Amino acid sequence: MHMLLFIGALALPVFVCTQSCEPASLSPRLAGVDLEKFRLTPNAEYVDSDQQIPISTTNVGLIEQSYVETAIKLVRETFPNATFRLREDHYVGDNGVAHVHFRQTVHNLDVDNGDFNVNVGRDGSVFSYGNSFYTGPVPSITQLTKRDFTDPVAALKFALTHLQLPITAEDVSVESTKHPHKYVLRGTSGAVTNPKARLVYFVKPDGTLCLVWRVETDVDDNWLLTYVDAKTAEEIHGVVDYVSEATFQVYGWGINDPGQVDSRAVLTDPWDLKESPLTWFRDGQKNWTTTRGNNGIAQENINNLPTYLNNFRPDSPTQNFSYEYPAGGSPKDYINASITQLFYTANAYHDLLYTLGFNEKAGNFQWNNSGLGGKEKDYVILNAQDGASRNNADFATPPDGSPARMRMYLFTHTTPPRDGVFESGIVIHEYTHGLSMRLTGGPDNSRCLSAFESASMGEGWGDFMATAIRLKPSDTRATDYGMGMWVYNNEKGIRQYLYSTSMETNPLNYTSLNRMWEAHAGGTVWASMLYEVLWNLIDRHGKNDGPRPTFDERGVPKDGKYLAMKIVIDAMALQPCNPDFVQARNAILDADQALTGGQNKCEIWTGFAKRGLGQGAEYGRGRRVGSYDIPGDVCQKKI
């Protein structure tokens, strides 16, 4: 049986609103509460591949036992007095670099923001590493032995009250789990799932260590980890939000929005069996005849229901998903076309990311991993025309093994409203949140893009990937792009500036961050830097306008566009938890070193230096010092 997709040439749109398409705080839908003040404070360091790493290793190649032992040895030599545990999400990327992750412990409890990631090269030696381990005095175990801390219900109630969460908890019961300090809190109402609480240590913004309850609450709009002081249950030390606010007849891959073409296209079996061996409709157990499969499940959620399995989705016994999309029609009239478009774009992006290295081992989103590593049963829940909000889109990324959730909304800047799923850049931007959160810090840790600069880069990566995908054959480095232009009916889009290599059109640079406090604004700075790097690489290597990259014998994309995307993705897995701009830049340089032997240092340094992130650029709490210098031995050039 063949599947027909009516896909319009809606090239992947350039825009995707993560937390909020309009300027917004960390969690815009928490009325009266600004979660920005609870963002985690970055405390990571990153030792890149250019620095000498003093550890002796046996170069036996990447055998699992050997690369894990090498990583353990590095952690022990770096922090000889620290205790820690090896996480289970280590893997070898398709660039040949192994990624091993550790969590610091104190008195057998996790230090929840104490992370150490080790990257081991093809030869078995340490390539680079990052860490945010706590190095101060360890608190006495007395607080634990005497149980001098509050119960988890008190912590939950304080979080609900202080953050004004729409959950009632008047008659809560505590259920123990296999973990001695982890509990399920039953008897609440208003949450998608039962809240959870876990006793952990937490490094506070002032650098001290304290015992906290990590309270997990999912209310759709916000999926929070709230760190409540365990002694008093009257203070919140930090908050992480998993939600980032972004035959088929469809707008095809590379078509950004309906404004670019007159009609949609009909596609037959558009998947690639190397990337989706079960196709888009099978999950290893059943061959579905609706918009459901191994990579995602798409449905309408007009009434903002908390569940999704029984929501409406089109069904075709012949897998012929061709539906009308009338120009100027009411959104409800084309709900079948909307769901089909969302299912298509998400699956197509899954397949592209797979070939660029975001596979099962790396923590991608699939129900069935076919024994290829990683945790299963975590496809993406795709809600079209979700009734929870307007003029927005969002993506929730829990750790590997739990389904992600994308909610696409209607945009009311036109009459009738426009459906965000038809601007594929929004879908791409949102899905990229899942990519960057699963790779940064490892698949089992979704808390590593929670500081201001790291969250900003989370937004910037989404804009960058959406923009790179929508490039047209006629584009040059003089081509400018906006984000959200179609849904907002505005040629300038929703960002402060267009993405451009012209400093007159877009003057943003590294020190612009000193005047910014919101992640979407900061993300525009990061994406502007990546846009410079993108065109530098295209000018050197050319541009492949096809839907998939071609690789040389080393696994390196042969063109500049896909090479830029590949290096950016590889760097996410190298960088530390909650990186800053300087560390992320260094990780991109390291990614090129691992993939090509550093053949593109000049192009990368030149792109970053043009916008103030050159050699010598520095980050210090809230204050950045820019630099336009390029290392003298890289390309003998200074901006």
Curated annotation (Swiss-Prot):
The active site is at E430. Residues 1-16 form the signal peptide. Induction: Expression is controlled by the prtT transcription factor. It is an enzyme of class 3 (hydrolase). GO terms for biological process: proteolysis. The keyword Amino-acid biosynthesis does not apply. Zn(2+) binds at H429, H433. Its main location: secreted. Residues 17-245 form a propeptide. Glycans are attached at N287, N320, N336, N368, N509. Keywords: Glycoprotein, Hydrolase, Metal-binding, Metalloprotease, Protease, Secreted, Signal, Zinc, Zymogen. CDD domains: M36. Binds 1 zinc ion per subunit. GO terms for cellular component: extracellular region. It holds the Pfam family FTP. Its EC number is 3.4.24.-. Its cofactor is Zn(2+). It is found in: Secreted. One of its GO terms (molecular function) is zinc ion binding. Belongs to the peptidase M36 family. Secreted metalloproteinase that allows assimilation of proteinaceous substrates. This is Extracellular metalloproteinase NpIII.
